[in-house]
Amino acid sequence: ISGSKNASLPILAATLLFDKPVVIKNLPRVRDINTMLNLLKSLGSKIILSRDKKTAKIINKKNMKTYASYALVKTMRGSILVLGPLISKYHKSKTSLPGGCLIGARPVNYHLTALKKLGMKFELKDGYILAKSKGKLTGTTINFPKISVGATENSIIAASLAKGKTVLKNCAIEPEIKDLTNFLNKAGAKIKWTGRVCKIEGVNSLNETEYSVMADRIEAGTFCVAATLAKGNLQIKNLNPNIIGTEIKLLKKVGAKIK
């Protein structure tokens, strides 16, 4: 099973927080991952890919750029995830809205509202978010009006280096988000979960680390369904079965034998 694209994108964005090298393993070979790696390169990161392109070593320069151009951002909604780490680490960012002027800020309004509560000031101009903060972001309590995966991820990443404690309420709790927090915690962040509440105690910096991205649960579930329909035998490797627990229960109900 391939690594999860939806877990890889926020983890790659979060590498912008690091002064020290980071190694991310089990990346899927899909276009959005290449786009995110190219976006990191454009910001100043040095990317060293393994021969199979599933492992990336990321080394950030001391003076990183903070401009995420429309040319790179337009093809991938997940590129808005660089806004949180850029404003948290470098206190400024010029990030294109996904889709530019045509779509506007509505798809990312929960991101902007949450980051504003952490201390980001911004204006929208010509399809770009022009953002800055006076020094470090400051921990606060944020209650998301609706559950948003991207806004939860951006807020967690940004709050990891903020001053003091941040409490995020009504968070999305998909396994990919838990994978992001596992990665950050492995690097020294202080993030705890209680249901849909995420508590983050800001730290000054993150440590050099290696991390393997979780398996793609959509791909795993698809293979399981296909094997059940075909009445065939299938062995799945590189998978924590807990991430497709619901699918396994349903397949067992229709007669699949899974162990």
Where does each model-flagged region fall?
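Short, structured segments at the rim of ligand-binding sites
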Residues: 1-259
